[in-house]
Amino acid sequence: MLVAALASLSLALGAAGSAQARVGLPPVVNRVPTQEKVVFITIDDGWNHDPEAARILLEKRVPVSLFLLPGAASYDTEYFTRLIGEGRASVENHTVNHPDLTTLDAAGKDAEVCGAGEQLQAAFGRTPKLLRPPYGAVNDEVRLAAKACGVKALVTWTYDFTTWGETPPTPRLRSGDIVLLHFTPTLAADLQRALDAAKAAGLKPAALMPHLKTAGLV
């Protein structure tokens, strides 16, 4: 696929030195600089297709970025196409198999990032431009691979609202925060808690990509 391109880019960056290696690579974003009273809701993976969470997203018209694994989306694509078509959802890249990308060679990174992009494009008719690296694991080699696959920004998160065992403490959200959720059995409750936290802070959910553009990050 793009292994040769990755190798050429890697050699060029190495010759330019470590400082130059960061020039032109997609940014890693865990919070969006903005003066607007907004937060960004993101949901990962896609294994649990919760109808109650879908109802909340659709009824409240919540802008949301879905960082999907192609396999998780493939057995019920209609669940996600409804969120896109009737709601305010966009589908983004979360790799094929959810590996720690920093542990893979160039070919492995290419297969995971480009491969997921191609599969999601085939399923939803749009090539994702944002990547959430699994576990938030990222380095310049991951950014280089992402760039070769057409990724404009790597998006991590400010706060994880997912209930992993016990309900986590609810932080006070600030403008530009990125909220992480997962398609788990607790998604509906986690989503409502995040929306309540945003409302308590005087913030509204907003679409991520337009604000990344406004901030000059993509």
Task: Describe the predicted segments one by one.
Residues 1-21:
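Secretory targeting and sorting signals
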Residues 22-100, 119:
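Active-site beta->alpha N-cap acidic-glycine motif
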Residues 22-35, 59-60, 74, 188-218:
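C-terminal domain-boundary segment and adjacent tail
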Residues 38, 52, 78, 108-111, ...:
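Extracytoplasmic/secreted proteins, especially bacterial periplasmic and envelope-associated proteins
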Residues 39-43, 64-68, 90-93, 129-133, ...:
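Structural recognition of the beta-strand scaffold that forms the well-ordered cores
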Residues 46-49, 68-77, 100-106, 132-138, ...:
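Acidic-and-aromatic substrate-binding clefts and catalytic sites of carbohydrate-active enzymes
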Residues 56-58, 62-63, 90, 106-139, ...:
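CE4/NodB-like, metal-dependent polysaccharide N-deacetylase domain
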Residues 127, 137-175, 203-214:
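His/Asp/Glu-enriched short active-site or ligand-binding loop at hydrolase and phosphoryl-transfer sites
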